[in-house]
Amino acid sequence: MANILVVDDELGIRDLLSEILNDEGHSVDLAENATQARAARAAGMYDLVLLDIWMPDTDGVSLLKEWASAGVLTMPVIMMSGHATIDTAVEATRIGAFSFLEKPITLQKLLKA
């Protein structure tokens, strides 16, 4: 199946998404911040990235912009947040995000995306 990178500063979210995606047969790598996400992206190719918008070191929209301007936004990215506004979601899709998931994320929401 797919090789997926989950980027979220909340351990519970990373664990939940990893469990759901592994149960569906996907290979999952986890990153707790933008620094780890950059390293994971540099080390491997992903079929999909699930990227949290609000993280302590660099927010997900800034990381998305960084990947787009560097020409490494070669995979679909689904942005995630429990606090984002519609404007933030629209900005992310303009930059290149494929979709947006509002937290809390359920199995049905995730598999629909």
What are the functions of these language-model segments?
Residues 8, 52, 81:
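Active-site residues of response regulator receiver
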Residues 11-29:
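Two-component/phosphorelay signaling modules centered on CheY-like receiver
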Residues 14, 56, 70, 81, ...:
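The feature encodes the CheY-like receiver
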Residues 25-32, 36, 40:
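Short hydrophobic/Thr-rich beta-strand motif most characteristic of the beta2 strand and flanking loop
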Residues 32-33, 59-62:
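Acidic catalytic/metal-coordinating carboxylates
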